[in-house]
Amino acid sequence: MAVCARLCGVGPARGCRRRQQRRGPAETAAADSEADTDPEEERIEAGPARCSLLELPPELLVEIFASLPGTDLPSLAQVCSRFRRILHTDTIWRRRCREEYGVCENLRKLEITGVSCRDVYAKLLHRYRHILGLWQPDIGPYGGLLNVVVDGLFIIGWMYLPPHDPHVGDPMRFKPLFRIHLMERKSATVECMYGHKGPHNGHIQIVKRDEFSTKCNQTDHHRMSGGRQEEFRTWLREEWGRTLEDIFHEHMQELILMKFIYTSQYDNCLTYRRIYLPPSHPDDLIKPGLFKGTYGSHGLEIVMLSFHGSRARGTKITGDPNIPAGQQTVEIDLQRRIQLPDVENLRNFNELSRIVLEVREQVRQEQEAGEGPAPHREPAVKDPEGPPAKASKEAGPGAEAAEQSSTSGQGQPFVLPAGVSSRNEDYPRTCRLCFYGTGLIAGHGFTSPERTPGVFVLFDEDRFGFLWLELKSFSLYSRVQATFQNADAPSPQAFDEMLRNIQSLTS
């Protein structure tokens, strides 16, 4: 009881009187007639003590205020002048910078420049908090993946790039496009990082919560002394890891030159729209997320794999003139498993084609009869918590064998049929499961788009493939292993809306 009494020295005494309040009249009278063995407790219970936050010592107030969200502290400063003075304590704001934004730097060095932790929180971190996370730039059909993070005492926008074609298993590359930091007490400084001449003056405008734009105020820093030819050669080495002479395919050369001309005209003056990572569910086939995939002459692109009940969808985060960013590149029917033939028969393209086209005919007949799932019309998630993938009657007798092989961990032998091209020959030779799916193909400029049948091949938790039947082409996808902060959708509905928005921009 003595411990409780000491605690109540900084608060109302009612907490120590609970025992007395719970007694009946007889117990109270008996207790009053007994001598209390704790004089300190007797003094506290004898008279009601009143105490407020204003009476607490400054050290305790600092601890209390430092544990509150930074957004609540301005209201406390308006209570009284004492609170306002205490809230100038840098310890409070150092803790808020660390707990809310992960700033673990030694902030004491800021004292040299006259910038306080309070300035860092209010004028840098809190002011630009809405641009943290993942974004897709509006660069025509090409798109992109921007990750804005707090990095020490900077906020940096990193553009994530796929590895050089065709090394889909290599880690992602990234380069800074802009940074924000606090040089003086007045305001934060925005710098453009584009080009090869170092940081220079830039500007950021937050259009709305899920959209912002960047502008370079010194685009001459993007130019090189050797003119456009030197700029193109440098861009080609960074983008493709090779020279134009190394690329013998004429159509591929045209695509590369077209991308350089189109993307370089923006000069880092771009509009970005927020994207979210897909929500996961325990019944998902594999963990959803971002993957790098091979797309023939277009090189490597970034695709977001998400699950929607009995279907999985791959949405392009980066794109090309045929299928632009934001479009749904593949859709997989998780209720239609495909049992591959043995390796010898699998080498025969006609045999695999026969199996896939039989499934497509079943789908067509069911849709016409109204028995099967309705045709896909939009990327909205109608049933985000739908049933897990399982064998269906339409999948044929091989579905049970596929399920057994997946649970046993043995897998199925896999080899590409003769005549099927692949940018990367280093694909796994065993797979866990195969499903019927469709892929989106179109002419240049996204003309005459249509969905064509194919086979989704699941290799493991981090790799899958898609065999484009009509194109006789195989795309290999490998998971992006980077960790992204501030990228989770606030709700499944918000993720659905994001998919609709990025698709509508290029439809």
From Swiss-Prot:
The keyword Cell inner membrane does not apply. Gene3D superfamilies: 1.20.1280.50. One of its GO terms (molecular function) is cyclin binding. The modification Phosphothreonine is found at T37. The keyword Zinc applies. A motif (D box) lies at residues 50-55. Residues 33-42 have a biased composition (Acidic residues). One of its GO terms (cellular component) is cytoplasm. Residues 19-42, 364-421 are annotated as: Disordered. Pfam families: Cyclin_D1_bind, F-box-like. A motif (DDL motif) lies at residues 283-285. Pathway: Protein modification; protein ubiquitination. GO terms for biological process: anaphase-promoting complex-dependent catabolic process; cellular response to oxidative stress; DNA damage response; mitotic G1 DNA damage checkpoint signaling; positive regulation of dendrite morphogenesis; positive regulation of neuron migration; proteasome-mediated ubiquitin-dependent protein catabolic process; protein ubiquitination. Phosphorylation at Ser-264 by ATM following gamma-irradiation results in its stabilization. Phosphorylation at Ser-448 in absence of stress promotes its ubiquitination and degradation by the SCF(FBXO46) complex. Phosphorylation at Ser-33 by AKT1 promotes association with CDC20 and ubiquitination by the APC/C complex. It comes from the Eukaryota. Its main location: cytoplasm. Residues 374-385 have a biased composition (Basic and acidic residues). The modification Phosphoserine is found at S33, S264, S448. Substrate-recognition component of the SCF(FBXO31) protein ligase complex, which specifically mediates the ubiquitination of proteins amidated at their C-terminus in response to oxidative stress, leading to their degradation by the proteasome. FBXO31 specifically recognizes and binds C-terminal peptides bearing an amide: C-terminal amidation in response to oxidative stress takes place following protein fragmentation. Belongs to the FBXO31 family. This is F-box only protein 31. It comes from Rattus norvegicus.
